[in-house]
Regions:
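PLP-dependent aminotransferase-class I/II
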Residues: 13-68, 72-73, 80
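Generic beta-strand/beta-sheet core signal
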Residues: 14, 38-41, 63-66, 91-96, ...
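Conserved beta-loop-alpha segment that forms the PLP phosphate-binding cup at the N-terminus of a helix
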Residues: 1-8, 134
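Catalytic PLP-binding core of fold-type I/II PLP enzymes
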Residues: 74-114
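Short, surface-exposed connector motifs at secondary-structure boundaries
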Residues: 5-10, 59-62, 84-90
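Flexible loop/turn segments at secondary-structure boundaries
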Residues: 19-21, 44-45, 70-74, 99-104, ...
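Short secondary-structure boundary/capping segments
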Residues: 28, 81, 110-111, 130-135
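Active-site C-terminal subdomain of aminotransferase-like
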Residues: 122-169
Length: 169
C-alpha cells in the first residue's frame, strides 16, 4: 500500500521485526518492493535512528516497526521515526498487538500513517486450527481510503437512539 501511494519501491524494516511477520512481508513485497533492514539499538532495543537516517533513499516508500516489538520492548522514538519518514516523502507503518493499545499510546498519536496487526490475541476461536485474521487502519485521507475501496465499512446512526448500524460504504 505504501509503495502504491508514494510510487516508490523500498521499505525500511527494523531488524527486530517478528520472523513470521517478516516472512509474510517478504511474500507480499516480492517482485514489487524491496525490504531494507535497519539495525536496532542494543541498549534500548529501539530502532537505531542513525542507521535509519543512512538507509533512507529517494526510493524509500515507508518505515516499518512494531510496538511493542517482537522482543517485548516499546519503541519510544515513534514520533521521531514518523517525522523522519514524512520529511523524506515516505510513510510510517506500525505493526501492533491490539491488546497493548489499552495501555500504550496508539500509533496515530505519534504519526503513523498505516497501522496493522494480528487479531488472534483478541481471542479469535481456532476453528479447526485456522482462526487467523488481521486488521489494517489508515489515516482518514482519500489517498489511503482509495487503496481498499471494496473492503470499506462504515457506521451510521439508526432510527433508535443510541443504536448504530454497520455496512459497506
Amino acid at each position: 500500500m505504501a509503495g502504491r501511494i508514494t510510487k516508490r519501491g523500498e521499505a525500511l524494516v527494523v531488524d527486530t521485526t517478528g520472523p513470521d511477520r517478516l516472512l509474510v512481508m517478504k511474500n507480499y513485497c516480492h517482485g514489487v518492493m524491496s525490504l531494507v533492514p535497519v539495525r536496532h539499538d542494543p541498549v534500548t532495543g529501539g530502532m537505531d535512528i542513525e542507521d535509519l537516517a543512512l538507509k533512507f533513499t529517494e526510493k524509500t516508500a515507508a518505515v516499518y516497526f512494531e510496538n511493542p516489538s517482537y522482543l517485548g520492548f516499546l519503541e519510544t522514538q515513534g514520533q521521531q521515526i514518523a517525522e523522519m519518514a514524512h520529511a523524506r516523502g515516505g510513510l510510517c507503518v506500525v505493526g501492533v498487538d491490539p491488546i497493548s493499545l489499552g495501555v500504550i499510546a496508539p500509533p496515530s498519536h505519534y504519526g503513523a500513517d498505516i497501522v496493522c496487526g494480528d487479531i488472534q490475541p483478541l481471542g479469535v476461536h481456532m476453528n479447526f486450527g485456522g482462526g487467523q485474521g488481521g486488521f489494517i487502519s489508515t489515516r482518514d485521507e482519500e489517498r489511503f481510503v482509495m487503496e481498499y475501496p471494496s473492503l470499506l465499512f462504515g457506521i451510521a446512526k439508526t432510527a433508535v437512539e443510541g443504536e448504530w448500524g454497520f455496512g459497506d460504504v
